[in-house]
Amino acid sequence: MALAVAFASCDDPITRKERSLIDRQYKEGVLTASQSFDFTRWIDVSKGAYRLPSISADEDAKNTYWASASNQGYTMLSSSPTDYPVVPLEENGAAHGAIIRSIKGFYFFGIGTKVIAGALYTGQVDARNLVGKPLESTLFGQPYSSGIPEIVDFTYQYKAGEKVIHGQDKKVELPSEDRAAVSAVFYEVTDDASYLNGVTLQTDARIVAKGYVELEPTTPADTWQTYRLRLTPVDEARYEAVDFTTKKYRLALVFSSSFRGAEYIGAVGSELRLREVKLQDRIKSHH
């Protein structure tokens, strides 16, 4: 009797369906949700200074998952935690998202910029280069091994500031209106373990797949929209050779309030609001 029941349960249609779904999750090419960020938890980087989104209650304030070189660079000018380019989006005293904004800076005798474009990204800040080589101070990427990231869905609002300027008064052609920029870059970690930075983010030879979009102001102004950003292979051979058992990879997610902020070009008052970011991976077999 017991044997008969066992055989019957193995042939049960619901059991077969559940087993099929489980097996499907481990087949190469299947898209699965991997991570999501809602920006409801924030951490004080240091007392009285700025805050950053936190991914766990026990996250180390000196080694956060999210980083912002624009915030760290602004510590010399700010007098309040609410002044920074990246701050929490708060409702009734509780965080419900992130605000990334382009703010007024300081330019004097060739040092600094009149507009500081806010940027929030996964990675670190190299404080040694903040003043002399600011683009190299942004260390983009965090370890990633759940699969090959293919989709980044994010819910956002964006408004552009009134006037686009060059923060160092250079005579260059300027865009008529500011836009936000979002990048997702999946790259291989080579022997030197170096990071992509503001110079190499879009061009480094180690990039496996990437996605990029520029966002115009949302209309109506106060409505939330969801955008689906797809990462496409940059190097087919490197993409096909992805192997999480023998190699290491990082994923860089970069959100900026001014799409040409790295060139000191932007509009004071441009503001990108984020409420949720979700990732989907394409499973890569381990054999």
Over which residues does each language-model region extend?
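C-terminal motif of bacterial Sec signal peptides marking the signal peptidase cleavage site
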Residues: V5-S9
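Aromatic (Trp/Tyr/Phe) and Gly/Pro-enriched flexible surface segments
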Residues: D12-P149, P175-D222, T226, T232-F259, ...
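Extended, hydrophobic/aromatic-rich amphipathic alpha-helical segments that build helical scaffolds
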Residues: P149-Q157
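Short amphipathic, basic-aromatic surface patches that mediate peripheral association
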Residues: Y156-V172
